[in-house]
Amino acid sequence: MEAARALRLLLVVCGCLALPPLAEPVCPERCDCQHPQHLLCTNRGLRVVPKTSSLPSPHDVLTYSLGGNFITNITAFDFHRLGQLRRLDLQYNQIRSLHPKTFEKLSRLEELYLGNNLLQALAPGTLAPLRKLRILYANGNEISRLSRGSFEGLESLVKLRLDGNALGALPDAVFAPLGNLLYLHLESNRIRFLGKNAFAQLGKLRFLNLSANELQPSLRHAATFAPLRSLSSLILSANNLQHLGPRIFQHLPRLGLLSLRGNQLTHLAPEAFWGLEALRELRLEGNRLSQLPTALLEPLHSLEALDLSGNELSALHPATFGHLGRLRELSLRNNALSALSGDIFAASPALYRLDLDGNGWTCDCRLRGLKRWMGDWHSQGRLLTVFVQCRHPPALRGKYLDYLDDQQLQNGSCADPSPSASLTADRRRQPLPTAAGEEMTPPAGLAEELPPQPQLQQQGRFLAGVAWDGAARELVGNRSALRLSRRGPGLQQPSPSVAAAAGPAPQSLDLHKKPQRGRPTRADPALAEPTPTASPGSAPSPAGDPWQRATKHRLGTEHQERAAQSDGGAGLPPLVSDPCDFNKFILCNLTVEAVGADSASVRWAVREHRSPRPLGGARFRLLFDRFGQQPKFHRFVYLPESSDSATLRELRGDTPYLVCVEGVLGGRVCPVAPRDHCAGLVTLPEAGSRGGVDYQLLTLALLTVNALLVLLALAAWASRWLRRKLRARRKGGAPVHVRHMYSTRRPLRSMGTGVSADFSGFQSHRPRTTVCALSEADLIEFPCDRFMDSAGGGAGGSLRREDRLLQRFAD
C-alpha cells in the first residue's frame, strides 16, 4: 500500500512539471480590452505605443485610442498589424514627427485625430495611403507650412481641422486634392495673405472659418472666394480688416452666414454685399463703423438676423433697412445713436427682437416717429421688451421714451442753427390764409409738426387747384399730430371765385406728384375738433382752416384746464393721466352679460373723467384665459377707444375662464395686474355634442362599487368563520366515553387501580355479558361492542386482548 501511494505522488509531480508555461496576457499592458473591437489606452501614462503582438486577433480591432499620453514618436511598425482599423486617436500627446510609413497598412482608416501635439509639418506622402479617410484633426500643433503633397490621396476627406497652428500663408491649390471637402477650419493661425487660387478645387466646401488670423487690412480680390460656389458659412471675425471692396463676395450665391465681427472695419463699399441674395445672418458687431451706406443692405433680401452692436454709428438713413422684409433680429446696441426715424423699421414686419440699449438718445421731437412706431407695436403685443432710455436733455435723463408725452419732447432742442433750417421754420410760422381770405399764424407748439406748405410766389394764399379738407387729429396711443390731406383722389379743381382770387399757379411746381399718405388710424371722438362757424361778414368755408381748427381746440382745452385750476376743479371731471389711477378710480363694474358654448360677452363702466390732450382718449385691454392656466393671461385683445363691452369668441365649451380688463393711456398700461376688475365665467356645453363626463356621478359610482366589494369580502370572511364553528361543533358531538378517554382531570393511579381490581379476576370461560357489567367506579366505560371484535378469535383471542389490557392499565 505504501509503495502504491508513493508511486501515485510521483506521477502527480511529474505531470505538474510537464505542463506548458502560462500564456502572456491577451491585452497590452496598461490598456483595456473589454471589447475585442475597441482597444482603449487613453490617459495611461504611456511613452511609446504598446505592442499589439499579444492580441489573439489584431485584425478585429476597429478603434484604437491612445490620447492623453506622453508618446513622442510614431514608428513604421506601431500599427502594421491593425489592417482593419477604422478610428485612430493620438490627441494630446507629444508627437513631434510621423514616420512616412506609419499609416501604410491602414488603408481602411476613416478617422484620424492628431490634434494638440507638437507636429511641425505634414510631410508629403505621409497620409497618402489613407484613401478612405473622412475626418482629419491636425489642430493645436505647430504646423507652419503646407504643401500640395501634404493632402495627396485624401479624395474622401470631408472635414479638416488645421486651427491653432502657425500657418502664415496658404499656397495656391494647396487643398486641390480635397475635392469632397465640406468643412475647413483655419482659425487661430497667422495667415496674412490669401492667394487668388488658395481655395481652388473646393467647389463642395460649405463651411470655412478664417477667424483670429492676421489678414491684410483690405479684401479686394473677389477671385479669392470664386471657387467656393457651395459655401454656406464664412467666418472672417477677429482679423485686422479695415475695408471691404465692392462685390468681394459676388461668387458666393449660397452663403447664408457671414461673420465680420471683431475687426477694424471703418468703411464698407456700397456694393460690398452685392450678390448675397441668400444671406440670412450678417454679424458686424465690434467694428468701428460710423455710418452705413444707404444701398449697403439693399441686395440682402433674405436677411433675417443683423448685428450692428458695438460700433460707432451716430445716424442711420431712414431707408437703410428698407429692403429687409424678412428681418427678424436686429441689434443696434452700444452705438452713438441719438435719434432714429420712425419709418426706419417700417419695411420689416417680421421683426420680433430689437436691441436699442446703450445709445445716447436725445429725447426731442426727432424721436416722435420712433415713439409712434413703438406704440403701435406695443399695442399689438410685440416688442414689449424694447425700451429707449433718454440721455439728453438733462431734464429727461433716465426716463423712457414710452412714458413721455409730446409736450415733453417739444423741449426746444430740435431747432437747427443752419440758415436753411431757420428759414424753413420762419416760413412755417408765416401767416397762412384761410379759404375766406383771412390770415392766421400757426401756434408755436404745432409749427414744427407740419411740413412746409406750398405757397404762391410773393403771395400768402393757398396754391390754386388744391383744396384742404381741414385738420384731422390722429390720436394713436399718446401721439397727436395734424394731418393735412387733399380731398378725394388727386387734386380738386376749385370754384371759379377761389381760382380767381388765388391767381395763376406757378409753373415750376409739379401738380401730378401724389401726396404721401400715412396709415389711417381711429380718431378720438371725444377730442374731435369742433366745426367752425362762419362769421356774418365772411364767406362760408366748407373745408375750414387747419390752423384755425387746431387753435380753437387748443385754446378751448387750455381754457377748460385754467378754469378747473381756478375754481378748484368744481364742476369738471377729474384729470387722469396714470393708467393705475384709471384702473383704480375710473374703471368699474365688470360684468358678464351673456355666455354661450364658444363665446361670452362682458361689459364694464367708465366714470366721467378727462384725459390730457397729448395722451388722447383711454383705450382698453381685455385679458382672458382658462382658469388656472400657466402662464396667466398670455392672450389679450386691445379694444378701441370709448368701448364699454366686448365679445370673446372661439372659446372652449364647458370650460371656466377668467376675464380681466384694464385701461391703456397713451400706449401705457399699469404694471400692476388688474385684480380689481376680473370676472369668472363657465362656458356652456356644446350643442349637439356628446355630454362630457360627469365626474360627480363617476365618483359616486366608484364609491358604490368599492362599498359592494367590501361587503362581499366581509360576507366571505363571515361565512368561512361560521363554517369553522360548525365543524368544531360537529366534532364536539362525539360520545361521552370518547371525551372521558382523553380527559386528564383525574389521576392515572386511581384509574389504574380500579381497572386492575376489576379485571384481575377475569376468566375466559365466563359469559361475555358479565364482562360488560363493570362497576360505576371505573374511570373508562367500554361498551359491549368494543369487546365483540375479538369474539371470532376464540379463547385465545380473548386472552391476548386481556393481556394487552392488563399491561396497559397495570399499576
Curated annotation (Swiss-Prot):
The UniProt record lists the keyword Hydrolase: no
Extracellular-side segments: 26-696
Renumbered residue ranges of the record's region Disordered: 484-549
Glycan-modified residues: 73, 209, 589
InterPro entries for the chain: Cys-rich_flank_reg_C, Dev_Immune_Receptor, FN3_dom, Leu-rich_rpt, Leu-rich_rpt_typical-subtyp, LRR_dom_sf
Induction: By bacterial lipopolysaccharides (LPS).
Transmembrane segments: 697-717
Entry's Gene Ontology cellular component terms: extracellular matrix; extracellular space; lipopolysaccharide receptor complex
Modified residues (Phosphoserine): 798
Membrane topology: Single-pass type I membrane protein
Signal peptide: 1-25
Protein name: TLR4 interactor with leucine rich repeats
